[in-house]
């Protein structure tokens, strides 16, 4: 097995490391932690501009198809910077689920909005006290206008 990074993978790592070094200092992170949202919407938009939110998504959805190695490289740099944005939960977990839906209409619009940095996604897969039993969900989704209310 060859564990050396390709030139493209090295460029991805170097670019992410440089971005976080220049735009994600310790004091900025501290201020974000104290803010109402707890993360930077500006950084989320920059991640979209850099193509990071499309990383690993199907090309037919407008994504950047690649192996999980590239995603792991980026996740390592998010960890190194102690980045607060929901990259793993939104872009990786939810993005990969929506990108692989057999019915593109089911998640295509949400995936597009996430890859453009206009929204963040959340995976509701556990509930307090459910003991990992998916047969009895307590969460109920009710249509409200253009969206849904989760209760």
Model feature map: region roles:
Residues 9, 20, 74:
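Residue-level signal for inorganic ion chemistry
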Residues 27-50:
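Short secondary-structure junction/hinge motifs that connect adjacent elements
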Residues 1-8:
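Intrinsic disorder at enzyme termini
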Residues 63-64, 104-151:
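Glycine-rich, Trp-frequent "lid" loop and neighboring beta-strands that shape
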Residues 19-23, 121:
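Short alpha-helical functional segments enriched in proximate histidine and acidic residues
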Residues 49-108, 112, 116-117:
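Internal helix-loop-helix
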Residues 10, 37-41, 88-95:
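An alpha-helix initiation/capping motif
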């Amino acid at each position: 097995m060859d564990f050396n990074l390709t030139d493209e993978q090295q460029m991805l790592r170097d670019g992410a490391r440089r971005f976080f070094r220049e735009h994600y200092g310790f004091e900025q992170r501290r201020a974000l932690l104290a803010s109402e949202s707890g993360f930077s919407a500006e950084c989320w938009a920059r991640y979209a501009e850099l193509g990071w939110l499309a990383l690993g998504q199907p090309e037919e959805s407008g994504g950047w198809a690649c192996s999980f190695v590239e995603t792991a490289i980026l996740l390592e740099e998010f960890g190194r910077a102690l980045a607060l944005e929901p990259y793993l939960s939104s872009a990786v977990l939810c993005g990969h689920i929506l990108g692989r839906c057999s019915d593109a209409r089911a998640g295509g619009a949400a995936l597009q909005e996430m890859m453009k940095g206009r929204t963040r996604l959340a995976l509701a897969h556990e509930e307090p006290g459910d003991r990992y039993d998916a047969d009895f969900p307590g969460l109920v989704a009710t249509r409200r206008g253009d969206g849904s209310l989760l209760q």
